[in-house]
């Protein structure tokens, strides 16, 4: 029941669902962070937590001098260790397992991360949601208000559609060159996504004792090595068998040392989770970096904006598009780009055609803000409940 409760809480938090009439205020790379990555991390957190609750995450073997539950609890809440110098010795003849053996004069590698894995995964899930939360609050529903009634597959009368298009066009013309703050907020959150995934890679590397950076490449090398010579790097980072030392007082008051052998069954799960996260973080960092570079190109090169607009408005002449782009600042372009993702092709093409004519014929006055438009006697935006039958759910 506790596991189902956690699943319900997580699903209510990340709200992974798709609405045809939901306002689009970001791109696919952005959604890979707050939807896919957050869902992956929270799911892994639930799986590890359920494994700890249902099974025995650690089972230690001793000579019977110490109760089993005592030594299990002690080794779980403190740490276990392996001997790196004993990793490559023959199992069954020289050592009992990888990293186990005579520890005299040998360096020890301590393992205490396993008790913190669910908490770290949950914290990482929150980290990947933060940029979206920041952007959603800074965006403040602007695109949803502008495009309300024309998004998705909602069928509306032609008169209503034309009226809505005219109002969107009026807002856009009247608010021309006032959206730069809006665009810079978006690009800042896009950069925040890239920084966040890089920080997470270094954070996990620190958490696993500096072994995460080369974890994926080591596993790939291992799979290509000769069967008789290879050593699994996953066992070195996530050992199944470890040692634990328990001290207690003997009958005469002297300190007695008890060596125990601990089986960490949960590491079979941990190694699979982190090898997947290694590849996913590398992919996510790559596409996020490309997205940031792409945004820089769009900001610095107006010809790129012409190409993007032309792609969604194929019937226009390049001269018309070039004239339109010259009148638009980067914030206006971003609003126009989001409109292309939320409006139907017909509505967007009609609006662009009228926009090219209007901006080519007149200068634009200063504009009211989106909030001011809600207080004028004839509001540009009709009530949300006019179409759709209910309140829109946002992520």
Curated annotation (Swiss-Prot):
GO molecular function: gap junction channel activity
GO BP annotations listed: dorsal closure; intercellular transport; monoatomic ion transmembrane transport; phototransduction; phototransduction, visible light
Location relative to the cell: Cell membrane; Cell junction, Gap junction; Cytoplasm; Lateral cell membrane
Signal peptide bounds: none
Phosphotyrosine: residues bearing it: 381
Residue(s) carrying Phosphoserine: 366, 377
Parts of the chain that traverse the membrane: 38-58, 115-135, 184-204, 273-293
Gene Ontology CC terms, in alphabetical order: apicolateral plasma membrane; cytoplasm; gap junction; lateral plasma membrane; membrane; plasma membrane
Cytoplasmic topological domain: 1-37, 136-183, 294-395
Main location: membrane
Extracellular-side segments: 59-114, 205-272
UniProt KW Protease keyword: no
Tissue distribution: In ovary, expressed in nurse cells and follicle cells. Expressed in embryonic epithelial cells. Ubiquitously expressed in stage 5 embryos. Expressed in foregut and hindgut from stage 11-17 and in proventriculus, epidermis and CNS in stage 16 embryos (at protein level). Expressed in anterior and ventral regions in stage 8 embryos. Repeating epidermal pattern emerges at stage 11, refines to one or two cells at each side of the segment borders by stage 13. Expressed in the imaginal wing disk. In pupae, expressed in the CNS and in secondary and tertiary pigment cells of the retina.
Keyword field: Cell junction, Cell membrane, Cytoplasm, Developmental protein, Gap junction, Ion channel, Ion transport, Membrane, Phosphoprotein, Transmembrane, Transmembrane helix, Transport
Pfam families tied to this protein: Innexin (PF00876)
Keyword Membrane: yes
Membrane topology recorded in Swiss-Prot or TrEMBL: Multi-pass membrane protein
Family: Belongs to the pannexin family.
Assembly: Heterooligomer of Inx2 (via cytoplasmic C-terminal region) and Inx3 (via cytoplasmic C-terminal region).
Primary role: Structural components of the gap junctions. Essential for proper epithelial development of the epidermis.
Protein name: Innexin inx3
């Amino acid at each position: 029941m506790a596991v189902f409760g956690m699943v319900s809480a997580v699903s209510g938090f990340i709200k992974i669902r798709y609405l045809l009439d939901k306002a689009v205020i970001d791109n696919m790379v952005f959604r890979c962070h707050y939807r896919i990555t957050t869902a992956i991390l929270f799911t892994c957190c639930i799986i590890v937590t359920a494994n700890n609750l249902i099974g025995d995450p650690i089972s230690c073997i001793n000579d019977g001098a110490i109760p089993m539950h005592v030594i299990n609890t002690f080794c779980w809440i403190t740490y276990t260790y392996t001997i790196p110098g004993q990793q490559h010795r023959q199992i069954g003849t020289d050592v009992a397992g990888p990293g186990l053996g005579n520890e005299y004069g040998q360096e020890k590698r301590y393992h205490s991360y396993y008790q913190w894995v669910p908490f770290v995964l949950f914290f990482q899930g929150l980290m990947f949601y933060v940029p979206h939360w920041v952007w959603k609050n800074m965006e403040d529903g602007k695109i949803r208000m502008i495009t309300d009634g024309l998004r998705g597959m909602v069928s509306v009368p032609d008169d209503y559609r034309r009226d809505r298009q005219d109002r969107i066009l009026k807002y856009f013309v009247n608010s021309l060159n006032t959206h730069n703050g809006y665009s810079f907020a978006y690009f800042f959150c896009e950069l925040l996504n890239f920084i966040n995934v890089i920080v997470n890679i270094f954070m996990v590397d620190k958490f696993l004792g500096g072994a995460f950076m080369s974890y994926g490449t080591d596993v790939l090398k291992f799979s290509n090595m000769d069967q008789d010579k290879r050593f699994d790097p996953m066992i070195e980072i996530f050992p199944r068998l470890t040692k634990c030392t328990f001290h207690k007082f003997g009958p005469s008051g002297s300190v007695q040392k008890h060596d125990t052998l601990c089986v960490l069954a949960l590491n079979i799960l941990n190694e699979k989770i982190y090898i997947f996260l290694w590849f996913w973080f590398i992919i996510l960092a790559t596409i996020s970096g490309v997205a940031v570079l792409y945004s820089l190109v769009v900001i610095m090169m107006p010809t790129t904006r012409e190409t993007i607009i032309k792609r969604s408005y194929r019937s226009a002449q390049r001269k018309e598009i070039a004239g339109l782009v010259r009148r638009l600042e980067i914030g206006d372009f971003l609003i126009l780009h989001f409109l292309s993702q939320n409006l139907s092709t017909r509505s967007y093409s009609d609006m662009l055609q009228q926009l090219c004519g209007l901006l080519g014929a007149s200068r634009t006055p200063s504009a009211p803000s989106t909030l001011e438009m809600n207080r004028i006697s004839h509001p540009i935006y009709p009530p949300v409940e006019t179409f759709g039958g209910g309140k829109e759910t946002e992520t």
